[in-house]
Structures are given as C-alpha cells and as structure tokens.
Amino acid sequence: MRKAAILLAASMLAGAAAAQDLSGGGYIDLRLVNSSGERAAIDGGLGKTRYGDDGNAIHLAEAALYGNLQLSEDLLIFADLRYEPSQRTAVDLLESYIRYRPLSLSPWRWSIKAGAFFPPISEENTAPGWTSPWTLTPSAINGWVGEELRTIGTEGKVEWRGEADRLEAEVAVFGWNDVAGVAIADRGWVLTDRVTGLFDRLRLPNAVAAPRHSAAWREPFTEIDNTPGWYAGLSWKHEDWGRLDLLYYDNEADPHAFQHEFAWRTKFVSVGASTNIGGVTVLSQVMSGDTTIQPSDEGYTSDFQAAYLLLGYRLGDWRVAARADVFATESQNKDPDARIAEHGTAQTVAVSWQPIQYLKLTLEGLRVASFRTQRLAYNLAPAQIDHQVQLGAKFMF
C-alpha cells in the first residue's frame, strides 16, 4: 500500500502537464533554535521537545512540495512530498490520496477517498504538511498524531449542509498502522513538529532498546496481523458558534502478533472544539485511550490522556497565540517495578508576522515540565524541565 502511495504521487506529477486544474505550493522552513533540557527523542533520549539539548543551532526543519490535481469536478488527487534532514529517504511522502466527491445540488453530499492521509482529528494542524497556522510546535496530541498515525486505506464521508450549520459523519478502514502506540508506551508524550513520513522510521529511547537487545527504531506504518483497523467520527459546524468534533479510533491490532516486531493494540477517543469569541480564536482538544502489547502471558498496557487549550488572535499581518497542554500516561503491569507513570504540563507562546505572501516569521517559546518514573531506572531525576525558543523563517512558493 505504501508503494501504491508513491505511484499515486508519481501519477499526479506525471499528469500535471496535461491537467486543466492544478494547484499547490511548497515551502522551506528554517529555524534558529535555543534549546535546553534532556536529549531529544529523535536522538534516543527522553526529552519532551524536538531539539532537546542541542543548545544554540540553525536547523532546516523541513522543505515540502504539495499539490492538488483536479481531474474533474468530482475527482481530485493530492500529494504532499517532504524533505527533512534526519529522515531515512531523500524525499518522503506525508500524504497521497485520491478523492471522489460527486457534485450535489441537495443538502446531502457524500465522498470517498483512498490512499494515505491523516485522520480527521486536529483542530490546530490545518495547514499543509500537518502544520499549524498558529505555532511552530503543535500540541502533545497532534505531535503524536503526526509521528505515529496515518490512515492507509479508505474513508467514506456523508455531509448534510444547512443554511447555517453542517453535519459530517465519516468511517474509515485502514491497515499498516499496527505499531501505533509504541512511542506513547516507551517514551511518553513529546511536543514536536517533526512528522514521520510514510517510509521513515520512529526513534525509540536508547534506554528502552538496549535492555531488550532490540533496535532503537520502529517503522510505524507496518502491517503485522493482516487485520484492518477502523475509526468513526462525527462533526458539527455552525457559522456563528464554531465546530465540535468526535472521533473513535481502534487499529484492531492483535497484541500477540509478531512480524519482525510486535503489534500494539491502540484505541482512543478524541473530542475537539473550535470557536471565535470577540475576535479571539479558541481551540481545544481532549484525548483518552490505551495501547497494549502482549508478547507473552503477561501483557503490558499503557493508558494515555492529553488535552490542550489554545487562544489565538489575528491582527492584519500578525498572529499571536498561547497554548496550555496537560498530559499523562500510566502503564498497567503485573510487575510493580516495570510500571511507568508520567504527567506533565506545557506552555507555548508564539508571535508570527507575514509581511509578504512568500515569507512568514515566527518567534515561539516553549516550556515543558514533566515527571516520568522511567527516568529513575537510568539514574536521571524523574522531574525535568525542557525549554525551547525558536525563530522560524518559512519561505513559501
């Protein structure tokens, strides 16, 4: 299926010259970063930010190229290609899908799409490349979605469009996401904007991999048990009151199954809301779920919860945003010494300025305070504070 996604993207680019309706764009995202705290998760640590203990550095966060190819009024192809210095391949795909949505003159409309795409879960990550128009770093919830979740399958949607409001219901069936949950269990929540590509790997903490004599990397988009997962969602949108979203997700993985690595049975409920009050944008989301692996008679389950509240204000070329996150995990294990618990909070403040269409500058400060018992096993203090300040320059075309 992942090879099919590549072929879909290639067919889109090949057909671009003959297309009558091609749109899209791209960007190069540079960062000047000052960060302190634990070693970053991408470097094998237990840190809670993308750049961890890097200190002062200049980074290419990513470069992306995305496009819509409208083959007809009903049929659309979308692809999002990305380069990021630490990814496994020179160019990777974040999404690639085809959508069929017949023209409807009635209040009812339906659509179906197939390929690889993000589940309809985010209130904040609404821009291309699983990015947010408000901050550089997404919430803990949406950082995890970008790292471990992708719908590689088919989603059907039904919409009812009223004069002032809209109702949507979607159901999806997917595969190749049997490892989703391993990062939550082995590392906990992380506030990061590094999205895992379809052909990329996910880094696990060195402290976890070494005792198991296993690799420190996992391929999150892997099919192990040949059993499809699914999700179902409902959304209500009112032009004056805002939007309310509900999603239930279950990858239906068999926690006993093994094929180079074990499957993780991951399921959760997500509730999100967005509105505008006196010119202030309010975004909020809550997630609660668990993930289970059972390589022997003794299973291992990690419960996880997270929530955030974001307030944003736009004035001309400027945007200002402040967000508060809370998050927690707790493992259920027969061996008390193997149980891991985590809780933490994060505060994010960002100011962005877009003086011209092709340039956006963003200054962001992030503070994460977390307590994780796992650190004690590696002679680290269980309570840690991570700081990260970034000046981002996004060049868009």
Locate each region found by the language model.
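Surface-exposed strand-loop-strand hairpins of Gram-negative outer-membrane beta-barrel proteins
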Residues: V33-A61, W217-P220
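Short, linear, compositionally biased motifs with a strong N-terminal bias
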Residues: A10-S11
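Short, P/G- and charge-enriched loop/turn segments at secondary-structure junctions
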Residues: G52-D53, A140-G143, R218-F221, Q259
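Outer membrane beta-barrel
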Residues: D21-S35, D54-R187, S235-E239, L310-R314, ...
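N-terminal signal peptide c-region/cleavage motif recognized by signal peptidases
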Residues: A14-A16
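Outer-membrane beta-barrel pore domains
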Residues: G37-R39, G52, S96-Y100, A116, ...
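Signature for the C-terminal beta-barrel architecture of outer-membrane proteins
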Residues: D21, A90, P102-I112, E148-R314, ...
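Sec-dependent signal peptide recognition
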Residues: R2-L7
